[in-house]
A protein has these predicted regions:
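Mg2+-dependent prenyl diphosphate-binding active-site environment of isoprenoid biosynthetic enzymes
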Residues: 16, 23-213
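N-terminal amphipathic/basic leader segments beginning at the initiator methionine
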Residues: 1-24
Length: 213
């Protein structure tokens, strides 16, 4: 049994149920859009971000429909950023398969990413999850700021250690922090939100440092 399997063992059923929620969230009535989103769904990753939401929620309470809403929102955001990142980086592959922009060109890839971001807004409003929308929106802002900060500093070749940590905190750690905070929020654990956000941020920093090394 792999180490990740050990970690996800307490939430295996929830992760399976999440796949259905995510598929429904990605569904589109426009045939071309639905074709692209179906392609993305079938080539899923390790689902680390939903894992953090579920584990934090289960640690503090009972997983419930709001928890599934939270996992769907963060995975929509993560997936949208991957699609947009591939356009920015002109990447031809993602997870061993052709990227969306490689198959359908940049214009469609950008619009698909935009569609997923719009789904975050609509699903949050439909479910009246304004607190979840707030922390996910903050993650969108920080991730965008981190990406632009990195581009700016790379052009001037003046990335200091302080700037490096600010970049990875915004680009990578902010989303993991959001996942952990969302897990706490979904079960009403208001007092633990800030601690779990910090926990997620530290994990995100460590993850990115290891990846960079």
């Amino acid at each position: 049994m792999h180490r990740l399997d050990d970690i996800t063992a307490p939430i295996q059923q929830e992760l399976l149920d999440f796949e259905i929620h995510f598929q429904n969230a990605m569904h589109a009535d426009v045939p071309l859009l639905d074709k692209v989103t179906s392609y993305i769904v079938k080539r899923k990753g390790k689902q680390l971000r939903p894992m953090f939401v579920f584990l934090c929620a289960k640690m503090l309470g009972q997983i419930n429909p709001i928890t599934f809403d939270a996992t769907t929102l963060v995975e929509l955001l993560h997936t949208a950023t991957l699609v947009h990142d591939d356009v920015v980086d002109d990447a031809a592959e993602r997870r061993g398969f052709f990227s969306v922009n490689a198959l359908w060109k940049n214009k469609i890839a950008v619009l698909v990413g935009d569609y997923m971001l719009s789904r975050i807004l609509l699903l949050s409003i439909e479910k009246r999850n304004m607190d979840l929308l707030e922390i996910v929106a903050r993650a969108v802002q920080e991730m965008s700021e981190g990406e632009l900060l990195q581009i700016e500093k790379a052009r001037h070749l003046d990335i200091t250690e302080e700037v490096y940590f600010e970049v990875i905190r915004k680009k990578t750690a902010s989303l993991i922090a959001t996942c952990c905070e969302a897990g706490a929020l979904s079960v009403g654990a208001q007092e633990e939100r800030s601690q779990l956000r910090l926990f997620g941020e530290l994990i995100g920093l460590a993850f990115q440092i290891k990846d960079d090394i």
